[in-house]
C-alpha cells in the first residue's frame, strides 16, 4: 500500500508504533501532522520508499485502540488521564533533575546549559494550556458545541505549535536527548524522562490536532 500521499498525523493514528518510527526520523507528526509522508520525507532528504516499507511492516500488527472513531467524550477523558495528569507529574520531576545536573556538572562542556529554564517554560505554558482546555474547550465539546469552538481551538493549536518549538529547543540543548559518556545516573534518568515526555506530548498533540479538534469542529 502506498503511504506517501497520506498525512503523517493520519498514519501515526492508524498504524501501530508509526509515531515512534516518525520520531526516529525526526518527522513532526503532531503540529506538522497535515503534511504528507512524501513531503515530510523530502524536507528531511529521506528515502520515502524505505519509510513506506517500515510502515507496511508495522501495519501488519493490530492497532490497540482506534481513536479516530471513538466518542469525543471518551477521547477527552483519555487525554486528561493519560496525558494531562502525566505531564503534571513529569515536568516538576524533570525540572528538579535538570537543576541538579546543571549545578553539579556546571564545569563540564557537555552540560545541557539552560535546560532547567526551558523545562520550566514548558511546564508553565502547558499548565496554563491544559487548564484552559479542561475548563473551557473540553466542556464545550462535551456539550455538543464543538462546531462553535473555532476561536478556542485556534488558540490551542497555536499553543501546541509553541510547545513543539520548545521541544525542539530542548532537543537541541540535550544533543537530541543523548547523554554523554560521563553522564551520571541522574543525568541518564533525566534524559530517559525527557524522551518519554517528548513521546507523550507529541502523541497528545497529535490526538487533539488530528482527531479531536477536526471532529469537534465538524459538529460531532
Swiss-Prot record:
It is found in: Cytoplasm. Gene3D superfamilies: nmb1532 protein domain like. Pfam families: Hemerythrin (PF01814), ScdA_N (PF04405). Keywords: Cytoplasm, Iron, Metal-binding, Stress response. The keyword Iron applies. One of its GO terms (biological process) is response to nitrosative stress. GO terms for cellular component: cytoplasm. It comes from the Bacteria. The keyword Iron applies. Belongs to the RIC family. YtfE subfamily. Homodimer. This is Iron-sulfur cluster repair protein YtfE.
